[in-house]
């Protein structure tokens, strides 16, 4: 059932693919059909939506304006289909979300597993992104939901759930600091440090701690990957800084130790679940929200 113009769907496909031919392949239709719909849409709007470049198609200024509207239309269409299916007792639908990399280790597999137990016909798409990228993906309607740590307040985002987690130093069990109940950044400064770059929210959390430490802090390694930072720490190449989320396997196998960080008191990071402000959630997405919210609250409670 189509409840919107094919031109809308074709425009979105071309935007994502970057070419008419690739969009047609993904849609399983003829290239001429896609091109015809794009030309028709441009004629109706009276402006080019794409710049035709040798390397492919690039959104024009008008195309960028239309993109957000199209994403919202497609989301609303999915919500309507989901609600109609729910009236018929059909547990189908699609959930698209973006999440920070650290949630891929254990959190997301747990949530997705519980979701599919009760909604086996729901399809889930996950896009991994940095904390600085996630708000735009949610606001622009590219995804239904975002999961990220310590996002700044944004009037275009609505926070559905939040949990607080201790930020800590991550080291091997034989590290000189491993036996501490807590550490300050100054305690860690005598060892090689593994720091996140500005793409991860941890960087912003660490900045005032670095200032308060009163010591020059020069990381041995900067990275935009939690997985890499974790692996570097596991190879005993330095001290990484993160929450316990994403370290579940290493902590249970005792290959890494998480030591709570102190800076004028405990240091916390917040894991939040977000949607676009004033949006309506399809039935399947709402079900996912309930499962993810329960998991966030459970883990925050276990954190103590």
Say what each PLM segment does:
Residues 92-155, 222-223:
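Central regulatory/effector-binding core of bacterial HTH transcription factors
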Residues 107, 257-301:
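A late-sequence structural motif
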Residues 155-161, 165, 180, 227-277:
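Beta-alpha-beta core module
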